[in-house]
Amino acid sequence: MVETHCHAQRHAVRIGEGEGDYANLADAMKTAVMADDADEDTDVVVYDNSERLLYDMDTYDVDMCVLLSAFGMTNELNRQMIEANPEKFVAAAAPVQTKKRALRGEEAWSWEAAADELDEWLSKDGFVMTGEGIRGDPTRTEPVPWRERKKHLRHVFDVAADHGVPVRWHTGYTSGYGGNHLFHLYPDWQDPTLASQLKAEYPEVPIVFDHGGMQAGWREDYVDKVTQVAGTFDDVYLEIGLYWGELMKKPINDPNIAIDQLLWGSDWGASMVQHSQPNEYPPTYWEQISSKGLPAHQPDYWGANQRQLLKFALDTDL
C-alpha cells in the first residue's frame, strides 16, 4: 500500500494573542525556516515529523509514502527523510526556495528560476515527480488569463518531460484561508479539464490529480471534471484517499477509467478534520472548520480513509 499524498514535515509557530487561525497561519508558514537553521527571531519552523509517520505506517500497514512540500516545507528536509529511510519514502519536487525568495522580497519570481530548481531536485535520487500542484508567483494578487498561465505551466511540463516524471495538478480546495485563494488566481485550479490541453501537448507526461477533485467539503463538481479527463487519457491518475465510500463509485464505475488510474492519496499531516453528519449525504467529509479553530492534535487520516475503502468494499460485495 502506497500513500501518494503525504506531508511528513510539521510546523512549529510562535504566535501572538488572537493570531492562531487558518488565515494568519497560512501566510506565516509560507516562509518557514528549517528547525536546524532557525534562530531566536524565527517565528515559524518546519521539522521532521517522520517518526510519527513511520509509526502510522506500521499501524496501518502502509509500505511507502510520497512526500510533498507545502506551506514552507522544504525539499531539503524531504531528502533527509529519504536518505534515512530510502525503502519507505520518495518525494515530489517543488520550487520552494524560488517562492520564498520572492515572498521575502529578495528576488523577483521567475518561471526560469522555478524550472531550474525543479530540474536540480529531480536530478537527485528519490525525487520522482513535481508537486504538490503547480503554483506561481506568490506575490501576484490578480487573476492570470489562461493563455498566459498555459505558457507558465509549460516550464514545469518541459522539466517533467526531460526527467520522465509525472506532473501533479492540484484539484479541490479547503475553506478557512483568508485572502485570494489560488483557485481565484489560476484558471487551471478552477477548471481541471484544462489539463487535457497540456496532456495533449505533452502526451509523454503523466498527470496526477492531487486529491482527485475532493480535497475537502461536500461539493463534487471537481470530481466530475477530473474523471472526465481521466476517462480520456489512460495515464491521468486520481487520488481517492479523501473520497467517502459512495463517491468512490464515480471513477470505479466509469468503464473508461482503469482501476490502476486510482491512487490511495489522502493528505497525511494536513490540518483538516473529519466532519460527521449521520443520516445526511455525505455522511462524513474532510474540512477546515473555522468556528472550531485549529485541531489540537494531528488528525488520523488513514484510519478514517481505510474505513471508507472498507465501506465501499462491503457495499459492493468485493
Residue ranges and their predicted role:
Residues 46-52, 74-76, 108-116, 149-153, ...:
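Well-ordered, non-membrane alpha-helical segments in soluble/globular domains
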